[in-house]
Amino acid sequence: MESNRDEAERCVRIGKAAIEAGDKEKARRFFSKAERLYPSSEARVLLDALEKNDTAGNGPQSEKMSKSTEQPKAEKDSSGDTGKGHTQDQVDGVQRIKKCKTYYEVLGVSPDAGEEDLKKAYRKLALKFHPDKNHAPGATEAFKKIGNAYAVLSNPEKRKQYDLTGSEDNVQNNHRNGGFDYHRGFEADITPEDLFNMFFGGGFPSGSVHTFSNGRTRYSHHQHHHHSGHDREEERADGGFSMFIQLMPIIVLILVSLLSQLMVSNPPYSLYPRSGQTIKRVTENLQISYYVSKDFKSEYNGMLLQKLEKNIEEDYVANVRNNCWRERQQKQDLLHAAKVYRDERLRMKAESISMENCKELNRLTSLFRGG
C-alpha cells in the first residue's frame, strides 16, 4: 500500500539521521521496520552496510570506545536528576525499582496478572516516577524500566518469550557500574514517554518533555508551554483534517472509478452470442455474423448502421489476422523442433494444424480484392 511505502521512507530517513548521530541501534531498528513495511533496495543496502560495519567494529577497541561514551552520558543524566529537590520516599522507591530482577517485580504484580492489573499498576507507578514529578537520582531510569516492563508484559508474544527466561538476568548479565541495563532482548516497540502519553493524554501541565527509547535512542529534555483544553481541541480538529487530506486521493479514485463504470455503456454488438445480445445479423459487405439486442433496429439504421458494420468488420478481420499469426507461429515452431530432434511425431502434429483462421483470412482478402 502507498501508506506503507510513505511510512517506510520515513523510517529510512530516521535511520539515516540516527547513523549521523552515531546511534547504530536506532538506525538498524528503523531500517528493519522499513523493510517490513515496504521492502526496498535502499533500506536493504543500508541495513546490510550497517551489519557489516558492526561486524568489523566489534573488537576490543570499539567496546572500549562504547564504554567511554556511555559513562559521560550516564553522568549527565544522573546530574539532571540530582539538580532538583526530592524526598527520601522517592529515593527509596527508585532503589526498589533498581533492585527488581523481573518485570513482574517492577510493576508489583503476580506472574498471572491480567491486562487490567497491569494497567492499574502501570498508571500508579508511572505517575509516581515520571521525571517531571520525581527528581530523585535514578528516577529517569526507573521510569524507563517501568515503561519497558509494562510494554513487554502487555504484549502477549513478548510476555510469552519473556516468561521462558524467568528473569532479566537470564537474558543478558551485563550490568554496567551498578546501573540499569536495557539491552536485554526484551525491549518495547514504544518509548516510555509515548506510552505515558497514551495513558494520560500528555505530560504534566508544568513539566518538561522527556524522550526515551530503552537505551537505543538518546535522552532529550526540553521545556514546553502547557496546552490548554482549547489547544487540544484544535489539535484534534487538525488531526481529523489531516486524516481527511490523506484519504482524499483514495476517495477521488473511488469516485472516478464509479463514474467511469456508470458512463461506459456496453457495445451495441458482439461477435458471439451472449446475454442480452442473441439476435443474429450479418454485415452487408463481408458477410460477418454478429449479435445484437432486440432494440437494435430502432437505434441503428442508415449511415449509422453502415458505420457500425464497418467497425464490426474491422474488429473481426483484426481478430482473424491475430489468430492466423498464432497458427503459423505454432506450426513453424513444431516443424523446426521436428527437424532439430528428427521427431516424426512433431512433424505430423504440425501438419495436422487446420489453419482455419488463415483460411478465413485468405477468404476475406479475396473479398477485398473483389474475387
UniProtKB/Swiss-Prot annotation:
Gene3D superfamilies: DnaJ domain (1.10.287.110). The chain crosses the membrane at residues 239-259. It comes from the Eukaryota. Pfam families: DnaJ, DUF1977. TPR repeats lie at residues 8-41. Residues 102-166 form the J domain. GO terms for cellular component: endoplasmic reticulum; endoplasmic reticulum membrane. Residues 218-229 have a biased composition (Basic residues). SUPFAM superfamilies: Chaperone J-domain. Residues 1-238 are cytoplasmic. Residues 48-92, 215-235 are annotated as: Disordered. Residues 64-89 have a biased composition (Basic and acidic residues). One of its GO terms (molecular function) is Hsp70 protein binding. The keyword Kinase does not apply. Residues 260-371 are lumenal. It is a single-pass membrane protein. Acts as a co-chaperone with HSPA8/Hsc70; required to promote protein folding and trafficking, prevent aggregation of client proteins, and promote unfolded proteins to endoplasmic reticulum-associated degradation (ERAD) pathway. Acts by determining hspa8/Hsc70's ATPase and polypeptide-binding activities. Can also act independently of hspa8/Hsc70: together with dnajb12, acts as a chaperone that promotes maturation of potassium channels by stabilizing nascent channel subunits and assembling them into tetramers. This is DnaJ homolog subfamily B member 14. It comes from Xenopus laevis. The gene is dnajb14.
